[in-house]
Every structure is written in C-alpha cells, then in structure tokens.
Amino acid sequence: MNIIDRFEQENISKRTANKKIPDFEAGDTVKVTVKIIDRSIEKDGKEKLTERFQAYEGVVIAKRNRGITSSFLVRKISHGEGVERRFMTYSPIVHSIDVVKYGVVCRAKLYYLRNRSGKSARIKERHIPIAKTKAAKA
C-alpha cells in the first residue's frame, strides 16, 4: 500500500467514525440528509451563520467508487421536472444516508431513466428478509 492509499484510508476512517454509510447500489431509493449553512448579515453588520438539515430523496442512478472521492448520483422528480444531484459519499456536508427501498435493476448506470416518465420509469422492489435487516440495524 503506497502513501496515497494509506492517506485516503485514514481520511475515510476519520470521516466515517461518527456516521454509518449503508451498502446501496444503483436502483435503490435513498434519503440523503445534507447540512446547509446559511449566511446572513444582520442590521449591525455582523455576519450570522445558521445550520439546518435538508433531506433529498430519490433513486440512485449511478455510483462511483473511487476511495475518498467516491460519489453517487440521485435523481428525483420535483414539481414535474427531473432533478439530479451528485453527492460525495465521504463529504462532511452529507449528514446521513438512509436506504428507503431496495431496487432490482440489471445495469450499473441508470441514465436511461432520464428519458422515461410514469410507469416506464418505475423500478421493481427487492425484498430483503426481516432477519437480515434487523441484524444489520443491531
């Protein structure tokens, strides 16, 4: 293992120390909670920073596993328009990742969903036995 790989592994372990990243893949529906920092200037000229959390729920259409620069692309339909957002897996901005539904797909990248709407854009649900999910949570 060279120096760069060791540095990446140390960084990944530091960033995942206080949060758990579940196993998910393309086709799964995830809920990503993101930390948003709002900056405003008060009347007296002082700068005020406020933090809030925002949830983004959608289907993972691509996942890129590249060490510390790993990312995944989530697509959702908002007010009739398709919205895609790429999240860095180990970013400090990503507060939590929860898998809502597991999907069954035969592709690693689901870019074809961009051209589909309605029933043709649906993904079959993969059912996982209750014993496995309870053991994973414990």
From Swiss-Prot:
Record GO biological process: translation
Pfam family, one: Ribosomal_L19
Gene Ontology molecular-function annotations: structural constituent of ribosome
Gene3D superfamilies from the UniProt entry: 2.30.30.790
Any one Gene Ontology cellular component term annotated for this protein: cytosolic large ribosomal subunit
UniProt keyword annotations, A-Z: Ribonucleoprotein, Ribosomal protein
Statement: the UniProt record of this protein carries the keyword Nucleotide-binding: no
UniProt-listed InterPro entries: Ribosomal_bL19, Ribosomal_bL19_sf, Translation_prot_SH3-like_sf
Record bears the keyword Ribosomal protein: yes
Similarity section: Belongs to the bacterial ribosomal protein bL19 family.
NCBIfam families: rplS_bact
Cross-referenced PANTHER family: LARGE RIBOSOMAL SUBUNIT PROTEIN BL19M, RIBOSOMAL PROTEIN L19
The protein's role, per its UniProt record: This protein is located at the 30S-50S ribosomal subunit interface and may play a role in the structure and function of the aminoacyl-tRNA binding site.
Protein name stated in the entry: Large ribosomal subunit protein bL19
Organism for this UniProt entry: Rickettsia africae (strain ESF-5)
